[in-house]
Amino acid sequence: VRTHERVLARIEADLATGRWALGERLPAERALAEELGVSRPSVREAIRVLEAMGIVRTAVGSGPDAGATVVDRPAAGLGAAVRLHVASGTLAVRDVVETRVLLETWAAGAAAERVVAAQGTGERGADPGPGAPEVAEALAAARALLDRMDDPALAAEEFRELDASFHVLLVRLAGNPLVEAVMTGLRGAIESYVAQGSAALPSWERTAARLRAEHRAVLAAVTAGDGDRAAREVRAHIEGFYAETGL
């Protein structure tokens, strides 16, 4: 085992036992090196790995924000790893598509369930259910994204960015942080194959019009609390585009 891997294992163990909590700073490089009996370059390499994984954020200097701070960015490491594997050819586009279908059909159903739960009880929902403000905010944000995508002057690249944001938002609405992190991590790979496929379409305008309608159908099902229909709509949406592009 390389020295920096021993440092990583020790930091992982300390995080697991709660020695360092979210938002706290790790000891200074010199202090960590002395505590673990390793060189400062080994500590430095371990911190770089942790930063790439989205576990810590580093800042230079001597102020209160200097050093390595424990953060919550799980999608950072996942996204970088997935993008590199897709680029190297070790992950096929079909693998990404199938993973999307698994994640997003589940998320669509779970999001619809949250919508129903948030409606609460009593006359006209007088007693809101759990997470009602967050659910209402997410639905409003999703509608706003789709409204922006209706702009006929929108460039294809901007459309795709809004499209990706809409899908990540729906997964966030499902309320599972880990699934959201995986989906966010997949975003770069998804945008890559969508851009590649879009370039081969005979008519982007026609496809964009269909995608707009499909997005509206997915959101309508989620808003209505119909999880089964939402899952069917999102599956047809994802697989339909993949089939159309012939990737």
Task: Pin down the residues of each PLM region.
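Inward-facing hydrophobic residues that define packing positions of alpha-helical scaffold repeats
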Residues: 142, 146, 183, 234-235
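Short linear motifs at protein or domain termini
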Residues: 1-102, 106-109, 113
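All-alpha effector-binding/dimerization core of bacterial HTH-type transcriptional repressors
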Residues: 75-173, 206, 210-223
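Short loop-to-helix capping motifs
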Residues: 28-29, 175-177, 225-227
